[in-house]
Swiss-Prot record:
This is Adenylate kinase. It comes from Mycolicibacterium smegmatis (strain ATCC 700084 / mc(2)155) (Mycobacterium smegmatis). Pathway: Purine metabolism; AMP biosynthesis via salvage pathway; AMP from ADP: step 1/1. Keywords: ATP-binding, Cytoplasm, Kinase, Nucleotide biosynthesis, Nucleotide-binding, Transferase. GO terms for biological process: AMP salvage.
């Protein structure tokens, strides 16, 4: 099963991706983890990404796409994967579609974890990070909405919404149900 998880910061995507990965026996692929691993391992893609990050620049989408493509070609992802934090734009969604088509496959589902802005504020402020002020959090939500609304339209035929409010196990059960599990 090949799944994309969408949702605002604090919606619980990472937590649910871990649980789904364990239950379904497929890897969770997070772009943040990919960057850290490739940089730590000193891979050519990691070194290229590090040059941008060290200069304080955003890593170009094309490089992120190459990292994801390299990761989905690993043996443990042959039967599927859960993408957490990718794609972030319609352009990346198109690149992912092309990657999968080149491998004679496609996405099975796109889950959007939905949480109210008030709930997200409560969750994110509860993490205790110094930079999680109301203003910063609201800006991150605004950026997420601006980036993601076009993605929701792009994936409208495959999109399933998951109410991400409630106990972890309740949300997990809803996610599994949305995947037909």
């Amino acid at each position: 099963m090949r799944v994309v998880l969408l949702g605002p910061p604090g919606a619980g995507k990472g937590t649910q991706a871990e649980k789904l990965s364990e239950k379904l026996g497929i890897p969770q692929i997070s772009t943040g983890d990919l960057f850290r691993k490739n940089i730590g391992d000193g891979t050519p893609l990691g070194l290229e990404a590090k040059r941008y990050l060290d200069a304080g620049d955003l890593v170009p989408a094309e490089l992120t796409n190459r990292l994801v493509e390299d990761r989905i070609d690993q043996p443990d992802a042959a039967e599927g994967f859960i993408l957490d934090g990718y794609p972030r734009s319609v352009e990346q969604a198109g690149a992912l579609k092309d990657m999968l088509a080149a491998r004679n496959t496609k996405l099975d589902a796109v889950l959007e974890f939905q949480v109210s802005e008030d709930e997200l504020l409560t969750r994110l402020k509860g993490r205790g990070r110094a930079d999680d002020t109301d203003e910063v959090i609201r800006n991150r939500m605004k950026v997420y909405r601006e980036e993601t609304e076009p993605l929701l339209e792009y994936y409208r035929d495959d999109l399933k919404t998951v109410n991400a409010v409630g106990a972890l196990d309740e949300v997990f059960a809803r996610a599994l149900s949305a995947l037909g599990q």
